[in-house]
Amino acid sequence: LPGRSQFGAGSTSTGVRETNIVCPGPSAMSKAEEAKKLAGRAAVENHVRNNQVLGIGSGSTIVHAVQRIAERVEQENLKLVCIPTSFQARQLILQYGLTLSDLDRHPEIDLAIDGADEVDADLNLIKGGGGCLTQEKIVAGNASRFIVIADFRKDSKNLGDQWHKGIPIEVIPMAYVPVSRTVTQKFGGVIELRMAVNKAGPVVTDNGNFILDWKFDRVHKWSEVNIAIKMIPGVVDTGLFINMAERVYFGMQDGSVNMREKPF
């Protein structure tokens, strides 16, 4: 990036530390897809170590991380155990021949890696575009370290700047109407029940629940909103991940990876 050392570190006004890592030039992939790959591989190189229990996130970006994990397992004979956050993540783990486990057998996770729909300047996240937000939050919350990988389109100053599909809220099916009314009455905006694409009716999560997408109309104090929504009867969890991410790796359009971290 202009004005920044190739491997230099700087800080933003919010105290988030940034590092820029230059990677090989783009392939024939789209820039966004190549950026996902670069971010995923950078996170795996920097954080995955032998004898770890890993939390494996969901979505399109995590595929590249799992591919690199599998390569390193074969090349370095790493002993790793993987905990999935969704049916998709479970299938990825099996597809690449990694060791599958669960929180019953491995309740303490060394490292969780996952994507995000949007990341703000304080490393707060919107997640759940793929409908796996509750499992993702459980795994991230039980990990010693939570690392996020994303492409350049997910980087925002404020939540909602780039992501316009709203904050997902997982709800018990019988409660979706009263939850929708309560959220909009308290916080404004519009709520939609997420509908399925290849089946009639709503999306049903791996937990058998519905997803509401809350399209908020202003910036809120997200830590307070997150708690308030979770207290509404019938809400399972929200797609707001507040103060959970330790580092975020953004794959950039120019083939570099921008790493941001919060001081702890």
From Swiss-Prot:
Segments of skewed composition (Polar residues): 8-17
Region (Disordered): 1-20
Keywords for this protein: Isomerase, Phosphoprotein
Residue positions where Phosphoserine is found in the record: S60
GO MF term list: ribose-5-phosphate isomerase activity
Enzyme Commission code(s) on record: 5.3.1.6
A Gene Ontology cellular-component term: cytoplasm
InterPro entries cross-referenced by the UniProt entry: NagB/RpiA_transferase-like, Ribose5P_isomerase_typA_subgr, Ribose5P_isomerase_type_A
EC primary class: isomerase
Pathways per UniProt: Carbohydrate degradation; pentose phosphate pathway; D-ribose 5-phosphate from D-ribulose 5-phosphate (non-oxidative stage): step 1/1
Family matches, as Pfam families: Rib_5-P_isom_A
Record's catalysed reaction(s): aldehydo-D-ribose 5-phosphate = D-ribulose 5-phosphate
Biological process per Gene Ontology, one example term: D-ribose metabolic process
Similarity annotation: Belongs to the ribose 5-phosphate isomerase family.
Name of the molecule in the record: Ribose-5-phosphate isomerase
Lineage, top ranks: Eukaryota, Metazoa, Chordata, Craniata, Vertebrata
Record gene name: RPIA
